[in-house]
């Protein structure tokens, strides 16, 4: 090869390298923006597969459909008739009220008698837990309910039913059965016990639970640690999982998914307990309270702010939230106060001005910084 041709190849290689050097920062910026933008994305498709429509509530604009749970338990699924509208969300108090009233009409239907052997069963009635099963029935005497979920190859899951009344013993039973494994045939045993501990009734049924909405694995790898302390009997809650934003996952001690929470977006960065309800972030700009039936009882829209990322209790019972003003270059620089009674959102501190001297010596994140996925942002 001649010297002249070698020089041509060297020049061409140099041009390519320069072009790549110029494109890499652009690619980093575009990739980082896409990465952070997913946190602000809100769900636009709430639709799901279900069976035939068996009835309709014209007053509450809700379709009653057959839940596709196999040949065992017969259950319903509630489908708001506006579910495909562009601005629809389950995290809307009006939508929740319509679903609640539909459930009340079913409970109070004088033509039907709901018993333990033939309960009112509704899969995910409030749209917040894809594998949560609502049960309602009455007993002749005040009793308590416990249940066991058996799936071949997995450890049995046993829990006490948390009745919506808050009572341990009652004649009217209304609760959400948690623990059904998605994508599996679940054999459920309900044990109905009297106040003296005697078993008054045992009910068996199967639930062929559909796959997860998210596609996330229902079985995690479990590694035995060195601690000798006993594990709690509750469920582990996973925070935001990239690639699966818009969901919250609850796993038992054996790494089996027992509940898949369906959110508007974002993820469960923090779950607070508010009486018998949980309070959590259901999108980057919304907080919600959810009761034990999966019903959303309160929603707070943060308006021009996005969470980033923690929430906690204030001294006077308000919620404090770390946030940022949408569209600003500065991020994670606002402290908000949210009044749980009024839903009023107040900005308490703008750290960019509160710590002005420190802010003046900082700069936006560069493509070569450790937090390169936030390139261009003033963190």
Where are these regions (language model features)?
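N-terminal Sec-pathway targeting helices
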Residues: 2-20
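Membrane-interface motif at the C-terminal end of an N-terminal transmembrane signal
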Residues: 21-45
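Long, solvent-exposed N-terminal ectodomains/accessory regions
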Residues: 36-39, 68-72, 115-117
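Long lumenal/extracellular ectodomains of secretory and single-pass membrane proteins
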Residues: 50-89
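Histidine-/acidic-rich catalytic cores in large beta-rich domains
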Residues: 74-104, 111-114, 119-147, 173-174, ...
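Short coil/turn motifs at secondary-structure junctions
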Residues: 152-154, 195
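Solvent-exposed serine/threonine-rich low-complexity stretches and specific carbohydrate-binding patches
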Residues: 154-168
């Amino acid at each position: 090869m001649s010297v002249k041709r070698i020089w041509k190849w060297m020049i061409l290689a140099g041009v390519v390298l320069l072009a790549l050097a110029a494109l890499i920062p652009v690619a980093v910026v575009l990739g980082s923006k896409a990465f952070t933008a997913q946190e602000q994305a809100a769900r636009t498709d709430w639709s799901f597969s279900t069976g035939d429509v068996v009835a309709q509530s014209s007053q509450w604009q809700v379709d009653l459909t057959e839940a596709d749970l196999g040949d065992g338990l017969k259950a319903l699924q509630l489908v708001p008739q506006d579910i495909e509208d562009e601005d629809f969300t389950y995290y809307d108090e009006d939508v929740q009220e319509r679903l609640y009233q539909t459930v009340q009409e079913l409970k109070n239907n004088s033509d039907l008698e709901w018993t333990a052997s033939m309960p009112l069963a509704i899969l995910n009635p409030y749209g917040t837990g894809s594998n949560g099963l609502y049960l309602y029935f009455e007993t002749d005497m005040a009793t308590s309910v416990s249940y066991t979920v058996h799936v071949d190859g997995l450890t049995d899951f046993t829990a006490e039913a948390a009745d919506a009344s808050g009572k341990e013993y009652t004649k009217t039973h209304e609760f959400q059965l948690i623990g059904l494994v998605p994508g599996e045939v679940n054999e459920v045993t309900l044990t109905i016990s009297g106040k003296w501990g005697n078993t008054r009734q045992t009910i068996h049924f199967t639930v062929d639970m559909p796959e997860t909405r998210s596609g996330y694995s229902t079985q995690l790898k479990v590694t035995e640690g060195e601690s000798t302390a006993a594990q709690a009997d509750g469920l582990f809650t996973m925070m935001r999982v990239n690639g699966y934003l818009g969901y919250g996952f609850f796993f038992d001690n054996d790494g089996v998914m027992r509940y898949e929470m369906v959110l508007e977006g974002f993820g469960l960065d923090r779950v607070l307990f508010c009486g018998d309800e949980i309070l959590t972030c259901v999108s980057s700009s919304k907080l919600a309270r959810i009761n034990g039936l999966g019903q959303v009882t309160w929603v707070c829209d943060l308006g021009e702010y996005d969470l980033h990322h923690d929430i906690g209790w204030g001294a006077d019972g308000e919620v404090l939230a770390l946030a940022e003003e949408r569209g600003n270059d500065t991020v994670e620089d606002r402290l908000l106060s949210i009044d749980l009674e009024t839903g009023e959102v107040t900005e308490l501190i703008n750290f960019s001005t509160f710590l002005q001297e420190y802010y003046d010596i900082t700069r936006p994140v560069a493509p070569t910084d450790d937090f390169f996925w936030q390139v261009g942002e003033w963190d």
